[in-house]
Design a protein with these regions (language model features):
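Bacterial N-terminal signal peptides that target proteins for export
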Residues: 1-11
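Acidic/proline-rich low-complexity IDRs
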Residues: 2, 15-17, 116-119
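Bacterial N-terminal signal peptides
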Residues: 9-19
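Extracytoplasmic c-type cytochrome modules immediately beyond a signal peptide or single-pass transmembrane anchor
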Residues: 23-145, 159-183
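The canonical Cys-X-X-Cys-His
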Residues: 146-158
Length: 183
């Protein structure tokens, strides 16, 4: 009888353990889905901004510039566009990261971010990577040089540490960082 009671307690404990793990797995799946949706949306808006706004207004003499707020004939650079949109969100973080960014503030913040970014740059078939990193769930999506002006700006910027970009290259990544506890 004791053996059966012990076995029953063991089975019950295992079931409780699995029940406790299911919400965690579901939460991770929800975070992954949310990260992918956010990244795909930001990628689409950024691409539309570059292809349909930046390239169009150039014809009228308006250009993207770092100091665009001081110039009536300038608009934000595509990276500034993403960062400005991300600055208006309080529940999670959207930004850009790169292995050779013009600004050091755009370097990856953790080793896991660096590794994900390296995978994006070496495996062109991978477009989005999601992962758990400590108390955060993160996703990165390749940020491509979609037009020649992206390449020219990065290759000619005085603070650029990398000057060999070509159209279509992975220049870095769009990143989303979400707290796993929902706060």
């Amino acid at each position: 009888m004791r053996l059966m009671t012990g076995a029953a307690v063991g089975v019950f404990a295992a079931i409780l353990g699995l029940a406790g793990a299911v919400p965690t797995v579901k939460a991770e799946e929800s975070l992954e889905m949310a990260a992918r949706y956010v990244l795909q949306t930001v990628q689409a808006f950024r691409a539309a901004y570059v292809l349909h706004v930046v390239e169009h207004v150039r014809e009228g003499g308006v250009t993207p510039k770092e100091d665009w707020t001081k110039n009536a004939h300038a608009i934000p650079l595509p990276a500034q566009f993403v960062k400005a949109a991300g600055a208006d969100i309080s529940d999670f973080e959207i930004g850009i990261i790169g292995l050779t960014p013009i600004y050091k503030t755009n370097l990856p913040k953790t080793q896991a971010e660096t590794e994900a970014l390296m995978k994006l740059t070496t495996d062109r078939s991978t477009r989005i990577i999601t992962f758990t990193d400590g108390k955060q769930f993160k996703g990165v999506a390749s940020d491509l040089a979609v037009v020649q002006s992206c390449v020219d700006c990065h290759n000619n910027h005085p603070d650029s540490s990398w000057r060999n970009f070509k159209k279509g290259d992975v220049m870095g990544a769009i990143i989303v960082r979400m707290n796993r506890d929902g706060r």
